[in-house]
Amino acid sequence: MREFLESLNSRGIDYVIVGAHSLAFHGRPRYTRDLDILVRATPENAAKLVDLLNHFGFGDASFKESDFTEPERLIQLGRAPNRIDLLTSITGVTSDEALTSKVPAELDGVPVFILGKDALIRNKRAVGRPQDIADLDTLQS
């Protein structure tokens, strides 16, 4: 996972970490079986991402740029607990809002970008599962 994060940075891929890792950064660590990464859904960013995936040995999966330019796409790489989920959108927050809200952080010793707290709150509120409601209580306290 560390090498994948480093490659996102070195290739200039526009991304933000969302989900439980974002929640942990903002104060509520919770076990998770994956790393959720929202990627900007543009042709340029998608081309860089496909190149990265080919570099990591996912060439057999035949990823295309269009896999990362359409909204509401989810690409899962690997298996839990080290699975990486690549998303092109999240609920309740536009991709532009999410990527603009990102804050610098560190994960496994790698500089990364985490979803901002206000955007995370809007996302949790929009998803609305019982776990998300519990997360909101912590985030807003």
Language-model segment annotations:
Residues 1-141:
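Compositionally biased terminal segments of proteins
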